[in-house]
From Swiss-Prot:
Keyword Oxidoreductase recorded: yes
Enzyme Commission code(s) on record: 1.7.1.7
HAMAP family named among the record's database cross-references: GMP_reduct_type2
Active site residues of this protein: 176
Similarity section: Belongs to the IMPDH/GMPR family. GuaC type 2 subfamily.
A single GO molecular function term of this UniProt record: GMP reductase activity
Amino acids binding NADP(+): 205-228
GO aspect biological process, one term: purine nucleotide metabolic process
Top enzyme class: oxidoreductase
Reaction(s) catalysed by this chain's protein: IMP + NH4(+) + NADP(+) = GMP + NADPH + 2 H(+)
Name of the protein this chain belongs to: GMP reductase
Pfam families in the record: IMPDH
């Protein structure tokens, strides 16, 4: 029964340290395997237009990080796959569920991407199940990520349809206002929703949304995530595609949600907003810091790799009064 599960979010949890068994944090292995491939970190920059573009995707792939290209420039996806493969890099793209996407997927048979993410706000839907089946029929070797969902029932249905991983999180992101506009979602209890969904999953879970600090990555892994999708922490870099804006001599980058009017181009069914983030240096610096912090997390967990994080104890401290958005 849902009402019987503990409800908490990232700021309500503290992980409990174990005896350290490594002599240097640099010995901690932060790598993760997804499908047939190994990546340096269990993090994914959100597949949003103000977070990732083709240049950043190439940079990430070359350096051994996982990425998911957004779906908002439909005509560029096929040339993008070709260009990545010509460089010996993996191709990871997004699709929606409109009728035209079925034809697009079929057209990829001659040069199939390694990863396809079905990317819609409410992923527990017949339209998503139908698209999973279509991709698996047309491109059986492609790894399919489906989402977004927020319940164990949704995870099981998408896995049963053929999804290789599911993305958990409805509305917890910094520029997502689904919870306010609709009354639905995992905002405010994203970590508990992740735990609930992961217990039902037989395949990898990707936690998506609500990450405000690097420590939240470790918490996500503790509660069942194989990988963590992050928006705001990856926004605002010099390389970020978001428009640069100057206010009182200080530079900012635009960051907006995929369901915002800025993305849609019209004020219809809006569930996202736009914010300005102070420009904060280079993406590579953030990735390095994330890795170092995660290595520290592994050392506190008393292990040598990410799996050690899954076995630590935790306490619920109920610091909900501390709003993660203020960090």
């Amino acid at each position: 029964m849902f009402n019987d599960i503990p409800v908490f979010d990232y700021e309500d949890i503290q992980l409990i340290p174990n005896k350290c068994i490594i002599t240097s944090r640099s010995q901690a292995d932060t790598s993760v395997t997804l499908g047939k491939y190994q990546f340096k970190l269990p993090v994914i920059p959100a597949n949003m237009q103000t977070i990732i573009d083709e240049t950043i995707a190439e940079q990430l792939a070359k350096e051994g990080y996982f990425y998911i290209m957004h779906r908002f420039d439909e005509d560029s996806r096929k040339p993008f796959i070709k260009r990545m493969h010509e460089q010996g890099l993996i191709a990871s793209i997004s699709v929606g569920v409109k009728a035209c996407e079925y034809e697009f997927v079929t057209s990829l048979k001659e040069d199939a991407p390694e990863f396809i993410t079905i990317d819609i706000a409410h992923g527990h839907a017949n339209s998503v199940i139908d698209m999973i089946k279509h991709i698996k029929t047309e491109l059986p070797e492609t790894f399919v990520i489906a989402g977004n969902v927020g319940t164990p029932e949704a995870v099981r249905e998408l896995e049963n349809a053929g999804a290789d991983a599911t993305k958990v999180g409805i509305g917890p992101g910094k520029v997502c206002i689904t919870k306010v506009k609709t009354g639905f979602g995992t905002g405010g209890w994203q970590l508990a929703a992740l735990r609930w969904c992961a217990k039902a999953a037989r395949k990898p879970i990707i936690a998506d949304g609500g990450i405000r600090t690097h420590g939240d990555i470790a918490k996500s892994i503790r509660f069942g995530a194989s990988m963590v999708m992050i928006g705001s922490l990856f926004a605002g870099h010099f390389e970020s595609p978001g428009k640069t804006v100057e206010v009182d001599g200080e530079t900012f980058k635009e960051y907006y949600g995929s369901a915002s009017e800025y993305q849609k181009g019209e004020h219809k069914n809006v569930e996202g907003k736009k914010i300005l983030l102070p420009t904060k240096g280079h993406l590579s610096d953030t990735l390095t810091e994330m890795q170092q912090d995660l290595q520290s997390s592994i050392s506190y967990a008393g292990g040598k790799d990410l799996d050690s994080l899954r076995h630590v104890d935790y306490v619920i401290v109920k610091n909900s009064i501390w709003n993660g958005d203020s960090i």
